[in-house]
């Protein structure tokens, strides 16, 4: 029997090669979202609620991403927003959102992104995964954020380094809203309490770009409830490699319950305020006890 301590450690992945594949896949998919977008684009289906929409372009773009990534790395797992999880044998999983900001895309608002990341661990388990490389690409503007573990974060090749944050009352704060009406009531209550405490609040409609804007200095801090691994994986690494932190509240990892991102001192203050407001608590009931 071999002593575990004498076994060779698993080889570290080639971060540069993985990052190049992230960017290649995101850019290829981005071309399709712009060039093949129908003029009469409509909702193909809904998911969690009538406002949680999927277009045919979401499906087409995810299929393309799966084809590109599985051809290049057949041993790796795949997890996409629209078509679910395929496990692999390598310990790496590609996590992607073909169109993050689908409602913006549906309305032809040019703030959406293709998000592609590769992670170690199990992205189906909260706190059970860690990104290795990622790319967030806005196909309309061409803005491309990239990050690799230990090699930094970049916007269009320019290294990103976050500076000292302002106090909370001078912080331009980003957020997003969910799809269930009860969740939205909770979020509205939290925003109503926070708005007098911050410089202002922005709701841009694309979580991956929101997070990258924090890394770029266009937002000071960001919080949102309801995000999944495909929303987070690439942009989380961009924030971390730029010198920021991404966490949950109440000692929890960043996950569906809550994500807070920015420079550590500001994140700690905002996270404490969100915890005080029970921002990750039960959704608000409908007036009069009616069901959503």
Label every PLM stretch briefly.
Residues 33-36, 58, 69, 102, ...:
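Residue-level signal for inorganic ion chemistry
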Residues 88-154:
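DPxDG-like acidic metal-binding loop motif
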Residues 1-99, 286-292:
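N-terminal subdomain of lithium-sensitive/metallo-dependent phosphomonoesterases centered on the IMPase/IPPase/PAP
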Residues 161-292:
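An extended, acidic
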Residues 46, 86-88, 124-127, 146, ...:
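Solvent-exposed alpha-helices and their adjacent loops that cap or buttress functional pockets
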Residues 59, 82, 98-101, 139, ...:
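Generic detector of well-ordered alpha-helical packing
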């Amino acid at each position: 029997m071999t002593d575990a301590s004498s076994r060779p450690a698993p080889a570290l992945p080639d971060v540069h090669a993985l990052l190049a594949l992230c960017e290649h896949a995101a850019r290829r998919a981005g071309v399709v979202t712009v060039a093949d977008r129908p003029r009469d684009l409509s909702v193909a289906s809904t998911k969690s609620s009538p406002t949680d929409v999927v277009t045919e372009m979401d499906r087409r773009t995810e299929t393309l991403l799966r084809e590109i990534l599985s051809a290049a790395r057949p041993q790796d797992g795949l997890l996409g927003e629209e078509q679910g999880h395929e496990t692999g044998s390598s310990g790496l999983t590609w996590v992607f959102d073909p169109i993050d900001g689908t409602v913006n895309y549906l309305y032809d608002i040019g703030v959406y992104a293709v998000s592609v990341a590769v992670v170690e661990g199990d992205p189906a388990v909260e706190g059970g995964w860690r990104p290795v490389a990622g790319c967030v690409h806005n196909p309309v503007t061409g803005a491309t954020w990239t990050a690799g573990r230990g090699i930094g974060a970049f916007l269009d090749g320019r290294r990103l380094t976050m500076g000292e944050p302002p106090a909370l009352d001078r912080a331009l704060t980003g957020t997003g809203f969910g799809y269930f009406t009860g969740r939205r009531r909770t979020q509205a209550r939290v925003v109503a309490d926070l708005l007098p405490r911050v410089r202002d609040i922005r709701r841009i409609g694309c979580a991956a770009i929101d997070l990258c804007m924090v890394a770029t200095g266009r937002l000071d801090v960001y919080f949102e409830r309801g995000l999944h691994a495909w929303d987070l994986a690439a942009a989380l690494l961009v924030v971390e490699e730029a010198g920021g932190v991404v966490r949950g509240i109440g000692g929890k990892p960043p996950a569906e319950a809550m994500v807070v991102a920015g420079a550590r001192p500001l994140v700690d203050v905002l996270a404490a305020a969100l915890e005080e407001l029970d921002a990750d608590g039960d959704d608000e009931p409908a007036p009069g006890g009616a069901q959503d």
